[in-house]
Amino acid sequence: MKYLSLFLLLVFSLSACTSDADNYATEAETAAAEPAGIAGNLDNPLGVQLWSFREKAQSGPEAMLAMVHDMGFRHVESAGMYDMTADEFAAAIKDAGLSVSSMHVSHDDLTNDMETVVANAKAVGAEYVGIAWYPREAGNFTEETARQAIADFNAFGKSLKDAGLKFFYHNHGYEPSPYGDGTLLDLIIDETDPELVTFEMDVLWTWLPNVDPVALIERHPGRFKLMHIKDMKPGLERGSLSGGLPEEDKSVIGEGQVDWPALLQAAEADGFEHYYLEDESTDPVGNAPKSVSYLTGITY
């Protein structure tokens, strides 16, 4: 009887090991079958800024997130949480098979409610937290405003770094007023602490005010870690510092003005970490896949 018991125990143990091995193999096969995301020739997969589909989200953010996954994206940059709590939004992101690598908040959020910003970022799993608009008088971005922004950004960066997060500023086209041998945007980049502040290059808002994005990267190596991939239609004039452009003037990537192969090559060489398609055209749902098709076909 003793030997029978030992035999049965051995059989049960072998069966359990085989079952565990089968389970691990199944999980590995599932992970391998799940696409890593859209990459093309980029070192890191292409993400999308969810602001692109804000109108789609009005009829249900869960359906919008599922659509984003179906387009091939696996990581996103958020801009709001659609009246959900951070935990609810994190669950919706997970259920859609997505992850949040970066999130946009407001200057007011960071000034008056840093604790909530940090809690929300950690709940959704974001590494980067940043702003895309600095409060100022309309049409008036001065040296005084730029220097106040520098102080704010360093303070925001310190608070977020202490919380294990990274702060960025996303340029928006009104900053490149001439200053010294450069612009006020150069001043902001030069005088913020690189240990505390990084930048997200919005290509449209770099291009529209007549700044060469490749030259900007080369002038400030290592300061840009994120990019918004966005363009304007051919034939439109550059030089505006308004920080705005009508939706109908925004272009499918590859059909606009920017030399994307040259820019992405420069960005990759400089060490950009995240790229987000942001489609603010009149038909983002229809145009985003066209932009993705172009971007994944780029070689350099």
PLM ranges: what are they?
Residues 2-7:
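Sec-dependent signal peptide recognition
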Residues 13-16:
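C-terminal motif of bacterial Sec signal peptides marking the signal peptidase cleavage site
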Residues 18-47, 58-69, 125, 182-201, ...:
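Histidine-acidic metal/acid-base catalytic patches
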Residues 48-52, 78-80, 102-107, 131-133, ...:
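A cross-domain feature marking catalytic cores of carbohydrate-active enzymes
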Residues 53-59, 75-88, 105-113, 137-140, ...:
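Acidic-and-aromatic substrate-binding clefts and catalytic sites of carbohydrate-active enzymes
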Residues 75, 107-198, 285:
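Active-site acidic/histidine proton-transfer and metal-coordination neighborhood
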Residues 85-103, 149, 165, 286-296, ...:
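Short acidic, glycine/proline-enriched helix-loop-strand junctions
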Residues 90-105, 153-156, 189-194, 260:
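Alpha-helix-loop-beta-strand connector modules within alpha/beta enzyme cores
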